[in-house]
Amino acid sequence: MFGFDNLILGVYLFNFLLILTATYTDIKERIIPHFVIILMLIVNLPIGYYFFGFDAITSFFATLILCLILGVGMGGGDVKMFTALSPLFAAETIYFVPKDISILIGLSALFAAIFPMTKILKNYWKDIIPSSAYLAMLIGIIVSITEIYSIGNTKTILWSYIILSIFISRKIPKYRIISNKLGYITPIYLIGFYLLNPAYFVSENVLISFFVYIGQLSLISLVIYALTGAEISSKKQISDLKEGDIIRDIVTIKENGEVTVENANILKRFKHMIYGEMGKLEGKSLMTDGEGLSDENLELLNKLQNEGKIGGELNVLTTYPFVPFVLVAYCVITLLNMGVINYLVG
């Protein structure tokens, strides 16, 4: 007779292999095979019921409902996978949804959001790092002055300027060039600071704080760059578009039959969506953030192209398979449950 630890370890490993298989097919073909979900259900439901009783069943249905509610941007295969895993994690639940499944969904979404940021950093690091160094230097100077001379209520104004500065650098090239050049003098700032006030430099960890600020400002810059149009996209022929593709363009069909195509960043698309919900837009708009293109959308675009109302290609956002991020998050959850991470950290 298997003990709890051996049996649960075996099931964890079995599910890992299934998710690994789904990761391969998701990368290659953007599908999750049915046999993966079926095998998960065949194993996880009985094992979950054996250990956790009826809680495993309620967790199954509660997770299904949660995934359907959060389903914008989540494919049907992802919903099935999270649901099929849920009976295995029914030991602790929040409103009948396993706590570990909630963390698994959250971590998967977080990893999926962070990964595209690495692409933006790869493309724009020559702007982001120097300007972040300049802003970190500015923060260090102002913070030290306010602390030495006991000046209060400056943080809100300072960080407001920092965020505004990053936005301005995206819109005004000359300002961005100046910010970048100022970033290269930060070594002089650090050396000069140490020579002027070595006691404060050491006691307040100015050097460490400087690099922490650079990290924080780089992350803020990545988010602002993404919001202001640095999303990774490519042009694609309308005839090559597939169901699920997310177009960056806003296609608007006006009441007089005129069609406009606007290459819009995420802020413009969000604003357009809000205006649409408020009924402030003229005509009908096609936006695919979240769920992607449907068969009806593809038919409409091909019709508009055949009628000569739009060009032959649109800007399509680069998206990534979701299951690889689920695999990483699953490894984190299982290692935590097995105490491996706590052992390594502790």
UniProtKB/Swiss-Prot annotation:
Keywords: Cell membrane, Hydrolase, Membrane, Protease, Transmembrane, Transmembrane helix. It is an enzyme of class 3 (hydrolase). GO terms for cellular component: plasma membrane. It comes from the Archaea. It is a multi-pass membrane protein. It is found in: Cell membrane. Its main location: membrane. The keyword Zinc-finger does not apply. The chain crosses the membrane at residues 1-21, 31-51, 56-76, 77-97, 101-121, 128-148, 149-169, 182-202, 206-226, 321-341. Coiled coil: none annotated. GO terms for molecular function: aspartic-type endopeptidase activity. It holds the Pfam family Arc_PepC. Its EC number is 3.4.-.-. Belongs to the peptidase A24 family. Peptidase that processes the N-terminus of prepilins. Specifically cleaves proteins with a class III (type IV pilin-like) signal sequence, such as the major structural pilin EpdE and the minor pilins EpdA, EpdC and EpdD. Is not able to cleave the preflagellin subunit FlaB2. This is Prepilin peptidase EppA. It comes from Methanococcus maripaludis (strain DSM 14266 / JCM 13030 / NBRC 101832 / S2 / LL). The gene is eppA.
